[in-house]
């Protein structure tokens, strides 16, 4: 018999391009992406022989994933309590505001993995790379960093997946999937079907 193994793919890859300059790539937003990012940043800082001067965050071809992981990644670079994303929908329970606070990115009562990050990670110059394959959670991060003027966003127009979908059960074991809300960046820009427009357009 075959036993199905649990395969965990690390969604964060990082390296020092040269002393003081870091490159971080996020391939998708999984359950541990926020923790993986915190570990990567800590390692980059300890591995750099000079103070950190800049960081590239690569979200190209990142299809998205978990919303709380997008909030965690944004919170690593933004001031505490900064608005990351909000939703507007047809019903009151479809309206949410998600901020750069542990209550919005921690699942359960785990420790805050962002608490001990170097303070300069919130202020060093930063470039975020995006393209047409950057969707959903990666658009939330790019939009939040752009709106708060925390990072220059560079690349091509993102995919434009900013809808919240709810599955409503019907009779006869069937269900219908409805779009019940949309995601908006902190400055009120709808992501759905529009995407994030980079500050610097570069079609690769």
Specify the residue positions occupied by each region the protein language model found:
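Cleft-lining beta-strand/loop regions that shape enzyme active-site pockets
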Residues: 1-168
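Short acidic, Pro/Gly- and aromatic-enriched capping/linker segments at domain boundaries
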Residues: 172-181
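Conserved functional hotspot residues or short segments at active or partner-binding sites
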Residues: 187-204
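N-terminal low-complexity, intrinsically disordered patches enriched in charged
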Residues: 74, 169-171, 197, 204
């Amino acid at each position: 018999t075959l036993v199905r193994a649990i395969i965990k793919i690390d969604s964060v890859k990082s390296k020092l391009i040269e002393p003081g300059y870091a490159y971080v790539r996020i391939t998708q937003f999984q359950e541990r992406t926020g923790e993986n990012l915190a570990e990567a940043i800590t390692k980059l800082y300890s591995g750099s022989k000079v103070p950190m001067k800049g960081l590239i965050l690569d979200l190209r071809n990142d299809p998205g994933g978990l919303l709380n992981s997008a909030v965690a990644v944004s919170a690593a670079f933004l001031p505490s309590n900064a608005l990351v994303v909000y939703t507007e929908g047809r019903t009151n329970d479809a309206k949410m505001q998600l901020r750069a606070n542990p209550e919005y990115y921690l699942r359960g009562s785990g420790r805050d993995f962002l608490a001990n990050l170097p303070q300069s990670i919130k202020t060093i110059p930063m470039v975020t790379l995006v393209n047409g394959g950057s969707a959903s959670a990666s658009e939330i991060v790019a939009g939040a960093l752009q709106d708060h003027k925390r990072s220059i966003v560079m690349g091509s127009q993102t995919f434009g997946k900013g809808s919240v979908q709810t599955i409503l059960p019907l009779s006869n074991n069937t269900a219908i999937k409805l779009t019940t809300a949309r995601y908006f960046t902190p400055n009120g820009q709808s992501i759905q079907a529009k995407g994030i427009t980079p500050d610097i357009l570069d079609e690769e």
